[in-house]
């Protein structure tokens, strides 16, 4: 069953026309209105036919839970087939709807809109953090972990026990301030922390569905970075030469930074046996949905992280205390997660993504906490160098109450490090394999949050995978494991940079990408054919990615096109430049809308400036032909 729960000032409907499966109704049933109501839009699905009564009971529980949270006494039950593409039979749907109605009557003022009729309806959503919630209800046996599923069957996805636990986990939401005080997240005054307020609302509401496309979707296409691939599954993208360049630069940078702290790069398989006893247990402890396939009569799943391969490798290794902390990293191209279709959008949430996945084996919890702090700082530094500052993301720290009681000072230091309030999620019981976790979350232009960097302290998998090390006394011990993605998914880094630029544009600033990531760093524009030789000479002398706009277009159009491509430096060459040997350069980062910053400099000075801006960041050559006239159009 799919549920969409809207806390509304009012909801009213009026039937218009029956469909072939319409239930028979009395005249009084043809219209209805409730004030201050919780409206439950519902779609009964084919899975639900296996046990309609369990679906009724669980739906009633969900509705009552939300009604209690929002203090609603009026409930409208509204059949809404558009929530699912895999509906149950009309007979089962009506019986489930009536069953829910009967179970709620007596406790609430309940009204049910008729099934199988075209209806006009009007609703006014209250707009508070809990006013829009969605729920998916699945029968326990509908999608057993270990069953082969088809890639195109949304209903047959594999759902881990951890994901189910995540849906039902009781969370205590707090704001941790740098002075170490914990405050209730829903009552704490977040004035001056607008993005944190949006993040808090997003986390508490758990509404992950996308109502409109965020700005980066149009930008990724216009800048010819990436696009949807209609020939693949949803959430699988194509990357054009510019996008591939940007991805590879970030990938290389993250791997290089990880190498500096001693991480060894490895490579592991994309698919694993779902019935492998160790892996099957881990599947149920990781909150993700998996793609599954069949190979030689074996049930396989596509990895959603590098944990499986690295832990199996750790199991087979001989490890001494002298080797600890032991770090291994893999740039997973790709990791696969069967994210729900309504959550997929652009580069923000994908089903196939590139993720740097590092694991650290530590001798004990004390060492793990120390490493956690170091990697927290490393992640801040990595995002900053990519172009995402502390002011651009919000911090979430998640832990069990027991861990917090034992490590208050350490957790407070995490808030002090970023010098701003952070969101805390606390659990009474440990639902997952970790006791402590942080994420840096980017809040985009439509107030949706996405996790970037993350580190977790894992207290289960050393035992599960039988990973050991020999201590100084020759005794066999279990390590404590850290999971770390230093930057988060590479695609999300690009998403965050594009969204950040779009929000800058909304504030009246000129949008930019970091120079080291810009596919073209300098564009040379000759005014006429006679200036082409000097333009070529300038472009060839630059120690950066430089191209030449040699198209038969007006200079004005060439300059506008360079602006639409966000080229950091645009050098226009005419008669005076040829005579003086200097070029007139527009510097995008120092420009304002309709007020370009133009500076005259030599080609050598321009080259030195760009070279210094790139600094020690990775570099790759131009991904396309140097002459624009030689380039194809991808979009």
UniProtKB/Swiss-Prot annotation:
Entry's Gene Ontology cellular component terms: cytoplasm
Known cofactor(s): Zn(2+)
Segments of this protein annotated with the region Editing domain: 1-144
Highest taxon listed in the record's lineage: Archaea
An annotated GO BP: threonyl-tRNA aminoacylation
Chain positions recorded as Zn(2+) binding sites: 307, 359, 483
Enzymatic reactions: tRNA(Thr) + L-threonine + ATP = L-threonyl-tRNA(Thr) + AMP + diphosphate + H(+)
UniProt-annotated location(s): Cytoplasm
Stretches the record annotates as Catalytic: 215-514
Family matches, as Pfam families: HGTP_anticodon, tRNA-synt_2b, tRNA-Thr_ED
UniProt keyword annotations, A-Z: Aminoacyl-tRNA synthetase, ATP-binding, Cytoplasm, Ligase, Metal-binding, Nucleotide-binding, Protein biosynthesis, RNA-binding, tRNA-binding, Zinc
Broad class of the protein's primary localization: cytoplasm
Cofactor binding note from Swiss-Prot or TrEMBL: Binds 1 zinc ion per subunit.
Known EC number: 6.1.1.3
GO molecular function, one term: threonine-tRNA ligase activity
HAMAP family in alphabetical order: Thr_tRNA_synth
Oligomer and partners: Homodimer.
Domain remark in the UniProt entry: The N-terminal domain is an archaea-specific tRNA-editing domain that hydrolyzes incorrectly charged L-seryl-tRNA(Thr). Catalysis of tRNA editing is performed by the charged tRNA itself.
Family of the protein in this entry: Belongs to the class-II aminoacyl-tRNA synthetase family.
Biological role: Catalyzes the attachment of threonine to tRNA(Thr) in a two-step reaction: L-threonine is first activated by ATP to form Thr-AMP and then transferred to the acceptor end of tRNA(Thr). Also edits incorrectly charged L-seryl-tRNA(Thr).
Protein name in the entry: Threonine--tRNA ligase
């Amino acid at each position: 069953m799919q549920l969409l729960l809207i806390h509304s000032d009012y909801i009213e409907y009026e039937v218009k026309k029956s469909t072939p499966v319409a239930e028979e109704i009395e005249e009084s049933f043809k219209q209805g209105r409730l004030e201050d109501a919780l409206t439950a839009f519902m779609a009964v699905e084919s899975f639900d036919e296996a046990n309609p009564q369990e679906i009724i009971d669980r739906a009633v529980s969900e509705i009552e839970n939300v009604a209690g949270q929002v203090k609603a006494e009026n409930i409208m039950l509204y059949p809404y087939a558009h929530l699912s593409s895999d509906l149950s039979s009309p007979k089962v749907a009506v019986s489930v709807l009536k069953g829910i109605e009967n179970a709620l009557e007596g406790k609430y003022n309940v009204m049910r809109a008729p099934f199988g009729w075209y209806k006009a309806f009007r609703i006014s959503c209250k707009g508070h953090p809990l006013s829009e919630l969605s729920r998916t209800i699945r029968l326990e046996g509908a999608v057993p972990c270990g069953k082969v599923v088809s890639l195109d069957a949304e209903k047959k996805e594999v759902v881990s026990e951890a994901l189910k636990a995540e849906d039902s986990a009781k969370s205590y939401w707090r704001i941790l301030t740098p002075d170490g005080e914990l405050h209730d997240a829903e009552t704490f005054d977040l004035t001056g922390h607008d993005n944190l307020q949006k993040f808090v609302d997003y986390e508490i509401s758990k509404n992950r569905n996308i109502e409109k496309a965020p700005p980066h979707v149009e930008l990724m296409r216009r800048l010819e970075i990436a696009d949807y691939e209609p020939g693949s599954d949803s959430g699988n993208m194509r990357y054009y030469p510019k996008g591939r360049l940007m991805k590879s630069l970030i990938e290389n940078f993250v791997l290089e930074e990880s190498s500096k702290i001693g991480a060894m790069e490895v490579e592991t398989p994309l698919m694993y046996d779902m019935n492998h006893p160790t892996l099957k247990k881990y599947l149920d402890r990781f909150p993700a949905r998996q793609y599954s396939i069949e190979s030689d009569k074996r049930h396989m799943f596509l990895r959603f992280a590098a944990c499986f391969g690295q832990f199996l490798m750790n199991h087979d290794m001989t490890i001494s205390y002298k080797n600890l902390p032991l770090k291994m990293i893999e740039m997973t191209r790709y990791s696969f997660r069967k994210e729900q279709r309504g959550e997929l959008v652009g580069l923000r949430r994908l089903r196939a993504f590139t993720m740097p996945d590092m694991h650290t084996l530590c001798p004990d919890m004390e060492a793990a906490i120390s490493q956690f702090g170091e990697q927290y700082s490393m992640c801040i530094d990595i995002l900053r160098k990519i172009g995402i500052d502390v002011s651009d993301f919000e911090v979430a720290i998640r832990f069990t109450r027991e861990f917090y009681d034992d490590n208050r000072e350490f957790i407070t230091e995490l808030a002090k490090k970023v010098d701003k309030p952070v969101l805390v999620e606390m659990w009474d019981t440990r639902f997952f394999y970790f006791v402590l976790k942080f994420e840096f979350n980017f809040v985009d232009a439509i107030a949706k949050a996405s996790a970037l960097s993350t580190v977790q302290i894992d207290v289960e998998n050393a035992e599960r995978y039988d990973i050991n090390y020999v201590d100084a006394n020759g005794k066999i011990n279990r390590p404590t494991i850290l999971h770390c993605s230093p930057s988060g998914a590479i695609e999300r880094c690009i998403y965050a940079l594009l969204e950040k630029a779009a929000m800058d544009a909304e504030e009246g600033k000129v949008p930019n990408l970091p120079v080291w990531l810009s596919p073209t760093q300098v564009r040379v524009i000759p005014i006429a054919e006679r200036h082409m030789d000097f333009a070529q000479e300038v472009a060839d002398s630059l120690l950066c990615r430089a191209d030449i706009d040699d198209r038969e277009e007006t200079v004005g159009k060439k300059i506008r096109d360079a602006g639409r491509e966000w080229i950091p430096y645009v050098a226009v060459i005419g008669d005076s430049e040829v005579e003086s040997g200097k070029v007139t350069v527009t510097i995008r980062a120092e420009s304002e809308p309709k007020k370009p910053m133009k500076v005259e400099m030599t080609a050598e000075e321009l080259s030195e400036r760009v070279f210094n801006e790139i600094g020690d960041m990775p570099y790759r050559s131009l991904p396309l032909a140097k002459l624009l006239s030689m380039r194809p159009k991808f979009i």
